[in-house]
Design a protein with these regions (language model features):
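Catalytic domains that recognize anionic headgroups
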Residues: 1-381
Length: 381
């Protein structure tokens, strides 16, 4: 069995992949995410099931569990609170790190429902962001280069076959640190677009939009460099997959970035680039649900019956579903890449194998919720 390397990057839009020349140098598929922000999207990717997006948590058997049972050494380096072990993301990994302290302990420090209530108000969110700017919070995460360094070291130390999952955060707003980042005032202004802004004008000018886009493209270029370096310096010749958890909006419908609580399913948010190198895929479009069965199947590993994705070596995906959950309601989008049907802010449940599950509030440790707020979320959703 061949080594498998999966790289996911935050906030990469399909129509901006030209800013990533290494990634764009491969055959790039148009992928549709199963969730609208990091946690439900990556949960569904790793679980191969739409239910994981509905519940916003990884559900076994995950890709790491399946490959681990087949004899793979499994390594996950995912520097975001959205992939905390409290949400099941560590399942199946021999080595897993999301670089957050105090996470993964659901018995400690349950969050305050009152604080959660306050976090739903634009005024509270904007005050919080003025005190704790996004750039400062992103600077607390390890740089992509450091994550790639560790990934190379961990991968080379492990016995083959090896499965490595790396998530890169350098493409998350404000698209850098220091002079690379969007200025704090502009970042806050863009975040408030589409809603009520309590501290001055909230309309982003054309010039300001170009500033944001330039920073975004530069960030994508830096991420691309790290993806190239990872594959160049790793021991061996792995099968390689690349995808993004979601995209970002840049004012096309008045909104900027990805903001889970808005339950947005616009194409800039849910259409992402997908690369499968060393795996012959049919078709030009896919769902991120397809990655787990395609990666496992390409190595001769039997895919579990609960997985709903398509093995892209054998068939095409012609329809996709995206669930945008937040608290007890969700927006759901169905599309066939030509038409799109959206049900907004609905009570959503899913029946699978005789069991019905619905969209619910996440109940997580206070430390994890604080880390999520630092990434721009009002609460854990």
């Amino acid at each position: 069995m061949r080594d498998v390397v999966l790289v996911t990057a935050d906030s990469v839009r399909r129509d901006f992949v030209d800013a990533m020349p290494f990634v764009a140098g491969h055959e790039v598929l148009t992928g549709v995410t199963a969730g609208n922000y990091t946690r439900p999207s990556l949960a569904a990717l790793q679980s191969g099931r739409l239910r994981a997006a509905v519940e916003s948590r990884a559900i076994g058997p995950t890709l790491a569990e399946v490959l681990g049972d087949a004899g793979y050494a499994t390594i996950g380096l995912v520097p975001t609170a959205q992939a905390d072990p409290a949400f099941g993301f560590d399942a199946g990994f021999d080595r897993y790190d999301n670089y957050m302290s105090g996470g993964g302990n659901p018995a400690k420090n349950r969050r305050s429902r009152f604080r959660e209530f306050l976090g739903s108000f634009d005024l509270v969110r904007q005050v919080y962001r003025r005190v704790y700017p996004m750039e400062a919070n992103m600077a607390d995460l390890p740089e992509d280069a450091a994550v790639i360094d560790e990934a190379i070291e961990r991968f080379d130390e492990a016995d083959p076959p090896r499965f490595l999952w790396v998530h890169l955060m350098g493409s998350h707003r404000p698209y850098g640190t220091g002079e690379d980042a969007i200025p704090g005032a502009l970042d806050r202004k863009a975040e408030a677009s589409g809603g009520r802004h309590w501290f001055g004008a909230s309309e982003v000018t054309a010039e300001e939009r170009e500033t944001i886009l330039a920073a975004y493209r530069d960030a994508l270029g830096r991420v691309d460099d790290e993806v190239r370096r990872l594959l160049r310096e790793l021991d061996g010749d792995p099968a390689f997959a690349f995808a993004a958890d979601h995209g970002d909006e840049f004012g096309e419908e008045g909104y900027y970035y990805h903001q889970g609580y808005r339950r947005r399913v616009a194409d800039p948010v849910i259409r992402v680039p997908v690369v499968l190198d060393g795996i012959d895929a049919v078709g030009e479009c896919c769902s991120l649900l397809d990655l787990a069965p395609t990666l496992a199947g390409s190595q001769g590993v039997e895919t579990p019956e609960p997985w709903q994705g398509t093995d892209l070596r054998e068939d095409t995906t012609d329809e996709t579903v995206t669930v945008a959950p937040w608290r007890e309601t969700a927006t759901v989008a169905w599309q066939d890449f030509e038409r799109k049907l959206v049900a907004r802010d609905a009570d959503v449940s899913m029946t699978e194998g005789g069991e019905t599950v619905g969209v619910e509030r996440a109940d997580v440790p206070a430390e994890v919720e604080a880390q999520l707020r630092d990434l721009g979320y009002s609460d854990a959703g």
